[in-house]
């Protein structure tokens, strides 16, 4: 009981207790529904609830929570020339503006939850493979993908320096010979590289 009270006090010491609570619940609710949903709901309803909560968590983490808790935001810019790049917005861009400093509680809990949630989904993925639950594996891959993408983008945003572009590719596909129908494959490759 003391640990719950201490955690409650920690949340209250945050600069944005409501946003931090929404952020932590956004990471926890899909996991709880994944673990306990089959006891109360059909698998279809469980899938839908988990996917909707994951989508809401992705949106809120990307657009609201990161902006309020660590003063960073990212988006993926797709230009008309088949080039895609990350775009970042960070407190580092505005050193002259007297913005409120980042609360260490907000920062620690944001980054901890951002890295713990995908780790939990990866563990669930291994458990699905061991138990041969391939239908649930689809859900876990979706969940892990959304969480890992957010973690990866925020990691890049945190390391980003104003005036530089994000140039490290997510991964590089091997160079392929240019046959007639490989245009789609090269577009796929360009999706994972940033210019």
Curated annotation (Swiss-Prot):
**TM region(s), chain numbering:** 12-34, 39-61, 109-128, 132-154
**Keyword Glycosyltransferase belongs to the record:** no
What is its membrane topology? Multi-pass membrane protein
Name the keywords, alphabetized: Golgi apparatus, Membrane, Transmembrane, Transmembrane helix
Q: Which GO terms describe its biological process?
A: protein secretion; vesicle-mediated transport
* Gene Ontology cellular component annotations, sorted alphabetically: Golgi membrane
- Annotated signal sequence is none
Principal location class: Golgi
Enumerate the Pfam families for this protein. DUF846 (PF05832)
As for family, the record states: Belongs to the TVP23 family.
What does the UniProt function comment say about this protein? Golgi membrane protein involved in vesicular trafficking.
UniProt protein name:
Golgi apparatus membrane protein TVP23
- Gene giving rise to this polypeptide: TVP23
